[in-house]
Amino acid sequence: AVIGTDYRALERMLSKKTDLSVLTVNTDGMELYDKGEEKAYLALFEKFSDKNEESEDMNDKDRPHIGIIGMTPQDVSDLKAANKIRKVYADQGMRAICYGMGDGLDEVRNASLAAKNVVVSPAALKAAQYLQKKFGTPYEIAYPLASELVPEVNYQGKKILIVQQQVIA
C-alpha cells in the first residue's frame, strides 16, 4: 500500500525534537533498493555538502582526497571493502573517503575538497554528477577492488552473465 507522508514536516519535527540534522527521502516501497539509495545519496550531498576552501592551516585529514560514492553493504558484500579501498589509495599516497561505509557527515560536508570521486555502484552516479556540477569535481565509474574479485581466466570470445552489481562486474 502507498500512503501519503509529509516528509518535510516529519524532518522538521524530528530535527526540532532531537536537535540533530535529519534527512528524509521520499520512497514508496514499490521500487528496488537502489532507487531509494540513489535518492538518499543525492539528498545527502544536496543538503550537507558545502563549498570549502583549502587553506594552509588545514590538517592532513581535511586536505583533498578521493571520494568513494556507493559503498554500502547492500552493493558491496565484503564488509572489509572500504578499508581495502582506503589502503589501495593510501598506497598511492592518497586518502580515500568512503561515503556510506565508515566515513561520517563531516566528510560529506567536506565533499568539495575531493580531487575526484569514484562511483562504485549505479545508485551513486546521480550524486557524483551533482557534485561535478556544484563543485566541478570530476568522477569516474570504477571499482578499485575488481581485480581481486575476478579470477584470472581468458575471457576472450566468452559470454558473461552479470548478476547484481554492474560496476563491480
Residue ranges and their predicted role:
Residues 1-169:
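An N-terminal assembly and electron-transfer interface module characteristic of large anaerobic redox
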